């Protein structure tokens, strides 16, 4: 479906420079876009790509348009002789692109008819809205509530007493255990598990060494998981239920694939967590935080609002102050790494030598005096 720039601006805002009747039917990167596609410039370092792009129109920030020779809604020297002549000027081209992309997906995706697939298993006490879409081999246990316009794809499991909020979409084989609350418009991708038991075991051992006897005693996890509105959870991510109170994911949190969130954690609103991060139990993460891929956060710590943890960093203590924190070792040339590792191994010997030299110098100074 093709849309005019005028139609896009009417829906999403912004200002048009060029032909308001220019039509676009999709989106593409600057260096690949054709005359029927809309591109965007989010980073000024790619400004040169705008000048050579074949895009029909470009989403661009005001300051970047000025660098191309246009300002105040009109081209200063007439139509451009190279590159696009049509622009939508907006303060945040990246976010604008995301909204337009979502609109094109929605337009291209035929709505699924409401109803329950014959192979689904639904307990008679469960409440399923008439507008919900229940796919093949879905299981909905006793007392569960499936709200309006929810879509449960093939193989989804919803445990007893769990609530799935309106407009949510659970992709194939996602599992939400008993006693969980999923807010409206949640997106839970394939294979994610919400509400499995937290990792809680009490040690019950006596003796030492080979004479040690006993075992680990499982601590029942009687809390649940409470997820706010507009949360997205990636494929194969696991969020453990609380030991006594709920694990809480606040509004608009975005969690990537294969993330582990331990029991009794609280993740603040608008925080984003990249893939393979691990967050141990009873940790609180503030609002608007960013957790990099494969970062590890110890249990029982608190991160304040607007904290950024870079990829592969390890957090072992609370970080209440906003800022960027790094503990990962970036990749370097293999030979350089080996030399650095050798130095690290010998740091204790170097320290001892320095102490010995300082002691000798101090003694010599005393003798000279």
From Swiss-Prot:
Keywords: Acyltransferase, Lipid A biosynthesis, Lipid biosynthesis, Lipid metabolism, Repeat, Transferase. It catalyses: a UDP-3-O-[(3R)-3-hydroxyacyl]-alpha-D-glucosamine + a (3R)-hydroxyacyl-[ACP] = a UDP-2-N,3-O-bis[(3R)-3-hydroxyacyl]-alpha-D-glucosamine + holo-[ACP] + H(+). GO terms for cellular component: membrane. It comes from the Bacteria. Its EC number is 2.3.1.191. Disulfide bonds: none annotated. Pathway: Bacterial outer membrane biogenesis; LPS lipid A biosynthesis. PROSITE patterns: HEXAPEP_TRANSFERASES. Pfam families: Hexapep (PF00132), Hexapep_2 (PF14602), LpxD (PF04613). Coiled coil: none annotated. One of its GO terms (molecular function) is N-acyltransferase activity. The active site is at 263 (proton acceptor). One of its GO terms (biological process) is lipid A biosynthetic process. Belongs to the transferase hexapeptide repeat family. LpxD subfamily. Catalyzes the N-acylation of UDP-3-O-acylglucosamine using 3-hydroxyacyl-ACP as the acyl donor. Is involved in the biosynthesis of lipid A, a phosphorylated glycolipid that anchors the lipopolysaccharide to the outer membrane of the cell. PANTHER family: UDP-3-O-ACYLGLUCOSAMINE N-ACYLTRANSFERASE, UDP-3-O-ACYLGLUCOSAMINE N-ACYLTRANSFERASE 1, MITOCHONDRIAL-RELATED. Homotrimer. HAMAP family: LpxD. This is UDP-3-O-acylglucosamine N-acyltransferase. The gene is lpxD.
């Amino acid at each position: 479906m093709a849309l005019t720039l005028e139609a896009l601006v009417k829906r999403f805002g912004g200002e048009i420079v060029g032909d308001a009747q220019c039509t676009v039917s999709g989106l593409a990167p600057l260096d690949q876009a054709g005359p029927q596609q809309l591109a965007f410039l989010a980073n000024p370092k790619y400004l040169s790509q705008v000048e050579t792009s074949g895009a029909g129109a470009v989403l661009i920030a005001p300051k970047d348009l000025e660098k191309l020779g246009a300002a105040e809604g009109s081209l200063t020297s007439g139509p451009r002789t190279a590159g696009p002549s049509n622009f939508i000027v907006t303060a945040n081209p990246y976010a604008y692109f995301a909204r337009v992309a979502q609109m094109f997906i929605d337009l291209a995706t035929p709505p699924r008819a409401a109803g329950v697939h014959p192979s689904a298993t639904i307990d008679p006490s469960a409440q399923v809205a008439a507008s919900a879409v229940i796919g093949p081999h879905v299981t909905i246990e006793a007392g569960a509530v499936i709200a309006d316009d929810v879509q449960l794809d093939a193989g989804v499991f919803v445990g007893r007493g769990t609530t799935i909020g309106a407009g949510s979409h659970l992709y194939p084989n996602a599992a939400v255990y008993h006693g969980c609350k999923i807010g409206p418009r949640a997106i839970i991708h394939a294979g994610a598990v919400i509400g499995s038991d937290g990792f809680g075991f009490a040690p019950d051992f006596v003796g030492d060494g080979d004479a040690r006897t006993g075992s680990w005693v499982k601590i029942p996890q009687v809390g649940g998981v409470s997820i706010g509105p507009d949360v997205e959870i990636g494929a194969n991510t696991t969020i453990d239920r609380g030991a006594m109170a709920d694990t809480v994911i606040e509004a608009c949190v975005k969690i990537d694939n294969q993330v582990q969130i331990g029991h009794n954690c609280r993740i603040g609103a608008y925080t984003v967590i990249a893939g393979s991060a691990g967050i141990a139990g009873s940790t609180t993460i503030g609002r608007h935080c960013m957790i990099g891929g494969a970062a590890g956060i110890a249990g029982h710590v608190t991160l304040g609002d607007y904290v950024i943890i870079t990829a592969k960093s390890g957090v072992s203590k609370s970080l209440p102050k906003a800022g960027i924190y790094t503990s990962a070792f970036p990749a370097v040339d293999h030979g350089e790494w080996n030399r650095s590792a050798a130095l690290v191994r010998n740091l204790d010997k170097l320290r001892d030598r320095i102490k010995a030299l300082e002691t000798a110098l101090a003694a010599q100074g005393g003798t000279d005096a």
